[in-house]
Amino acid sequence: GFCAEAGIKCNDIHCCGNLKCKAVGSNRV
């Protein structure tokens, strides 16, 4: 799966599982 953070897709392990990314509202897409 992927996350979208500020319009940027990141790998789950680097974004979804990252507390900073979660804090800014990253979402699975």
Swiss-Prot record:
The keyword Disulfide bond applies. Keywords: Disulfide bond, Secreted. It is found in: Secreted. Expressed by the venom gland. Coiled coil: none annotated. Disulfide bonds join 3-16, 10-21. Its main location: secreted. The keyword Disulfide bond applies. GO terms for cellular component: extracellular region. Belongs to the neurotoxin 33 family. This is U20-ctenitoxin-Co1a. It comes from Ctenus ornatus.
